[in-house]
Amino acid sequence: MQATAIIAASGIGKRMQLREGESKQLLEVGGFPVIYHTLKAFQMASSVKAIYIATRLENRSILEELAAASGFSKLKAIIEGGKERQDSVYNCIRAIEEEKRLTGASAEIILVHDGARPFIRSEEIDEIARLSMQYGACVPANRPKDTIKYVGENPEFFGETLDRSKLLQVQTPQGFQSNLLIQAHEQAELEGWYATDDAALVERFFPEQPVKIFETGYHNIKITTPEDIPVAEAIFSQISTRS
């Protein structure tokens, strides 16, 4: 089984309250940029044969130097990101398709991951790839710890409480058989339809396709706000102690 990874790393990190030109993927955790940890996990995953990163152009040289210095040999291309995350992923998909046209190289599975999730484990990546091959699609998730409620018609008040036992917090990498994901993105591009994750595109355009759940722990956080940095440092410290 061969998987290609797409890493979305072009977000400007508004909620991180960074200065103009800064990128949350380049913030340091454990003495290394966030994206270093992310790339290392995919480099170590035996199922992954190639990695494409979507990022801002001003980060290209930094990522090239990081990959060369760290021996990230699977990094195939650094692609310019789009206006939205979905555009960035689609830019990578088009690059993957162009590589296939030129060389005949193709992947059975495409994994789409948030660059700001640095603690996914290589064995989890391999298992998601395996389940994606078996079921067509697989998405990692964990169970919410908090009670979740709808906001009422009056947005200053709550509506009903949701059944927490039927809810999951969705994460990445999300895995798909390649043709399925490519067709979903192509259709979304034609219709101008946007979703917050890739599984939602598959759900919309291929409603008959089941999406396998892969439950993870709470280590696979997405670094989104300043409060996430000390949490990430604590997770890194715990991981380093165990290894």
From Swiss-Prot:
The keyword Nucleotidyltransferase applies. Pathway: Isoprenoid biosynthesis; isopentenyl diphosphate biosynthesis via DXP pathway; isopentenyl diphosphate from 1-deoxy-D-xylulose 5-phosphate: step 2/6. The record marks R164, K222 as: Positions MEP for the nucleophilic attack. It comes from the Bacteria. The record marks R15, K24 as: Transition state stabilizer. PROSITE patterns: ISPD (PS01295). Keywords: Isoprene biosynthesis, Nucleotidyltransferase, Transferase. Coiled coil: none annotated. Signal peptide: none annotated. InterPro entries: IspD, IspD/TarI, IspD/TarI_cytidylyltransf_bact, ISPD_synthase_CS, Nucleotide-diphossugar_trans. The keyword Ribosomal protein does not apply. GO terms for biological process: isopentenyl diphosphate biosynthetic process, methylerythritol 4-phosphate pathway. It catalyses: 2-C-methyl-D-erythritol 4-phosphate + CTP + H(+) = 4-CDP-2-C-methyl-D-erythritol + diphosphate. Its EC number is 2.7.7.60. One of its GO terms (molecular function) is 2-C-methyl-D-erythritol 4-phosphate cytidylyltransferase activity. Belongs to the IspD/TarI cytidylyltransferase family. IspD subfamily. Catalyzes the formation of 4-diphosphocytidyl-2-C-methyl-D-erythritol from CTP and 2-C-methyl-D-erythritol 4-phosphate (MEP). This is 2-C-methyl-D-erythritol 4-phosphate cytidylyltransferase. It comes from Pelodictyon phaeoclathratiforme (strain DSM 5477 / BU-1). The lineage of its organism: Bacteria, Pseudomonadati, Chlorobiota, Chlorobiia, Chlorobiales.
